[in-house]
């Protein structure tokens, strides 16, 4: 099956309605995808990209219905990933020796995937041109790390079509190919989802590459992507949208996501969200349970947000595994100009909140005061959680707020906290921690682990964790773990 694009250019790709996972399980496809391949028939015949390897036979069979494969003069591979070059090996069995134009990095990747170093590779550089007859040329533009080192774009003069590779694309499958034919809300949602989950780490490169392409002053009548719709109606709209997304994008939105063992952290999330709306009814607050909702939806919401709040119960003195995985994804996506805070419930020890706070700080977020609640939050603790949400709303507001609320109650409680994490005990007000002074008694005070009865002796210390002899308990690091049961400092009590 072919779809006419413009003049002597046709789409010869493959739709995939059933695919649900991309990059392993990194990206969940909710609308399928398409593998877009294009056939240009001027004096020279050019094939731009192939399809995923699972459709190799069908792709070649369809192509043979349109042309004699031997008439293909050149193959252009904009990207070596298997969903672009997957059918290349099967095609080259039919037409060995056909010149392949791609970047130097693509040669390395294609050979690594297909193991055919003897293929007729022709490496290109930005600005190189290939004459295809009838007064038309293909002009190549390298686009490294958008989103692989081998990536490039190809521009067809005369028809003013930019074959943009993954840029400006979407994992979106529809019987209709052009952007003006499909549901606009679905289309832009999928564009945003694609950018947020795949291209966000390369935003600075996106801006630089778009400006470079625009500096060539070439007309762009169509943008033919590698996945999803071809942009023929106002094609530069997606270029301008990319420039906006790449520029530290944020909306007036706060994303809260959490995982909870016994529903306690979920209760905190609900109360915090209510507190935010008490103060700033205009802000969009989105709440997600990472165990039940799609992670790519969550990451897309994070991309759109001015700030995020991450909650977890404490398990084995660390955060819940799915929260740890989400924070690893967030660190890799390298979000910029966003605020963050941690919260969570615990029983013996509240190590999860401390770790989340640290991970968010390391990931480049401007971190706010965190919040811990011991056991199941009661009415007073829920009130404090709600006030914490009010404080967050005030601190993160993008414009002056007109809503009145208990300013003294919120500000005083948060400002009195010197540590990065606030401890909320049921039926207890927040109080400023007492200043720790090392006394002679403290220097000799042994501490008992209330769980396993291991004893910390200051005279001995704990060399395996870098705690030197003669270190008083007050100077032992907060991330110290009992060597026997691996719980934190919170479970230790003084030996009377």
From Swiss-Prot:
Organism superkingdom: Bacteria
Domain Flavodoxin-like: start-end pairs: 254-393
Cofactor binding summary note: Binds 3 Fe cations per monomer. Binds 1 FMN per monomer.
Membrane listed as a keyword: no
Domain Rubredoxin-like: 444-495
Protein name: Anaerobic nitric oxide reductase flavorubredoxin
InterPro entries attached to this UniProt entry: Anaer_NO_rdtase_flvorubredoxin (IPR023957), Flavodoxin/NO_synth (IPR008254), Flavoprotein-like_sf (IPR029039), Metallo-B-lactamas (IPR001279), ODP_dom (IPR045761), RibonucZ/Hydroxyglut_hydro (IPR036866), Rubredoxin-like_dom (IPR024934), Rubredoxin_dom (IPR024935)
UniProt binding sites for Fe cation 3: 449, 452, 482, 485
Binding annotation for Fe cation 2: 83, 166, 227
Gene3D superfamilies: 2.20.28.10, 3.40.50.360, Ribonuclease Z/Hydroxyacylglutathione hydrolase-like
Subunit-structure text: Homotetramer.
SMART domains, per database record: Lactamase_B
Pfam families (UniProt xref): Flavodoxin_1, ODP, Rubredoxin
Transmembrane segment boundaries: none
Record flagged with keyword Membrane: no
